[in-house]
Each structure stands twice: as C-alpha cells, then as structure tokens.
Amino acid sequence: MIRNKDIAKIWVYNAGIDRTWQDKAYGVRKVNDLNEQIMFNKQGEIVLFLTGPDDIVFLTEKPDKEFLEDIKKFGYKDCQMIILPNEKNTISEYLFEHRDILKNINQEKLYIYIPYILSIFDEKICESLNLNIYGSNADMVKIINDKMNARKIMEQLSLPIVDGYLCNSRESLLKAHDLLVQKGCHKFAIKEPYNSAGKGVYFIRDDKQFASFARMMRFSKDESFEISIEQWLENKRDINYQIEISEDGNVELIAITEQIISVTSYKGTIYPARLSSTEVEMYEKYAQIIGKKLFDLGYRGLVGIDSMINENGEIIPAIEFNARLNQSSFYLPIMEFFAQKNRNTLIRSYDIQTNDRLDYKRLKRLLKQKQIYY
C-alpha cells in the first residue's frame, strides 16, 4: 500500500522522533547536537520520490524547481507541499502543536497519514482530526525497534543469531564478556535498545576499551534496562530487506538491498544486492517467517530488517528491526529505474565542506562537468 499512488497520503518525515524513546538516565552518556534536528528536517524532500499527485507533503524548505523537474524522470508528479518553520523539534511535534494546519486540508479525500516513524504525537494528531493512520501503534513500533526484543524474537523462532548475551547489570556484562572471550572472541559489538545513525551501537576493539566502556555504562537498579554484547563479525556483508505487513496478515517482500556500513554507521545502499539465487530464496523464506511472527505480535506496516552474511556464507536473518520507513524505501523508484536499464545503483552519503552555499543548481553543474550527472 505504501507505494500505491491511487491512495491519497499525507507524508510526515519525522526523523529524530526516536530520541523520545531514549532514557537518558541509563546507557552511555551522549552529547546531542542541537542542530541535528534541523538537518533531519531538511532531509524531508526525499519523501517526494514516493508521492503521488493527490498527496500532501510537509517540508521545512521549498525544494528547488529544477530539482522537482529533474526527478519527474523517476515518476515524481507535482503534489501539494506545505512549508513549515524549521525548528529544533520534529515535524510531528510541530504539527501536534499546530493541528489547525491539518484542519485546512480537503476533507473530501480519504487521506492516509504516513509518518516516517509512527509516534505518539502522530497518533494524537490523527485521533483529534479523525485521520486514518498507516501502521500499528506507537507502543508496538517502540517494542519492535528495541534491539533486545529483536534478539529475543529470533531466539523464539530458533533462527541463526550472532553469538552474544543480554545484560542488565555491570556484573552480567562482565560475565558475558568473559564467556565470549572463552569462545575465542576478542572484538565485540555492544548495543543499547535504541539507536539512530550508529549512535547506541559501539564497536569494542580490545579488552582495554571494554573495561573503560563497562565503567561508563549505567544500568538501572531494578535491572529493567538491558543491553547486548555480541561477537564482532569481520568480513561480513550487510543485507537489508523490507517487508510490508498488511492488516490481514499478508507479508510482502518489497526489496532486498546491500548496505554500506562504516563500523557501525549506515552510509549507503547498493541495489540490487549481490546475492545468489539460493540466498534470495532464503531471504524470501525468512521474510515470511519473521513477518508472520511480527503480525502475531500485533505489528502492521513497513519494517526494514537488517541482516548479515558471515564469512562462511551463513545468513544471520535479523540483527535488528527498523519498524518504520527506511532511508532506502524512498530511493526504490530510483533503484528500480536503473535496474530496468540493467544498471546497478549505489546510493550513499558524503560529507562535504564548502565555503559557499551548495545548492542544487551548483551541484548539478559540478556533476555535469565531471560527466557523472544522469
């Protein structure tokens, strides 16, 4: 349904809303960039690759007209854009405080409200304005996104998992570390329940770093806060597959992509994933098994499943669930466009520092000069 352009939709790109899940009293102390949310809000125009002509998109900056014209080759059609102030909170939080904005939309159309991440703010917006919302509910989204729950679900399904343990105290963390060392592990991944862009997942390269990290980790007295420590896999391949779970329990495999991961941070996507026919069949099978389990738990909507293929060729079918739209969800029309031309697609981010503003026209001109603009 997410890509059915015959259904009118309201798109809300609320990246950053998952910070509300974090309990700042536990885990490793983090330094938050106060301007990070402004950057997240600016990314909202990637939603345009999925929009239909009857859709409404909330943005914080009007896209370049030339950019809008250029992306029509990928299926974009002009839609209604509502420009909001770019503040240091998410678009969902802004709309919650300014619900009158949504009261002015055409009430004759049956819109589906689609947030990037379904939050309690989105639920309250839709409840107060009697709008249909995409997905299950905010509580279920939070539960499925919890990395500790992902590990528990995989154990319940008796599917392959990375060797590791759940820990709810410093003592249990130290014990788990020793058990992994006894098994021959010397590098580790330590994960908190929630993370975004690599925050909350930590690569531990040696015992000295582990000892320092164990001292920094803050646990709750009632042992309700859990983390995991797992073997760090070298020479792995990171595969993401997206499934959509309908209200009647149908599970559709949307796409399989290969991820570019720098240590713990997502940097980009390769499409199609470089998989054998046997591996594709295995992912199709795992999509159904995991999708049915998530449906039984009460989840509806899109979920991205991060997986690995280890150096022995064994598929670890899920290391975490992204119970939301994924970054690569928005790029699917681009990737499919080039796949039809028998081209592989690499989509990734680069950090660029400039002395002057780098707008779309200037970027396009530079790409043309290098003969890499399509």
Region spans (language model):
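Glycine-rich phosphate/pyrophosphate-binding beta-alpha loops
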Residues: 321-332
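A long amphipathic alpha-helix within ATP-dependent nucleotide-binding catalytic cores
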Residues: 231, 264-314, 352-374
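Conserved ATP-binding module of the ATP-grasp superfamily
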Residues: 160-162, 183-189, 205-234
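Conserved N-proximal alpha/beta basic substrate-recognition cap immediately N-terminal to
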Residues: 38, 43-46, 58-171, 175
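N-terminal "leader" segments that precede or initiate the main folded domain
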Residues: 1-72
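Conserved anion/nucleotide-ligand pocket segment
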Residues: 186-202
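A short beta-strand motif that forms the metal-chelation/ATP-contact edge
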Residues: 241-243, 315-323
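Membrane-embedded hairpin module used as a gating/binding unit in multi-pass transport
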Residues: 234-275
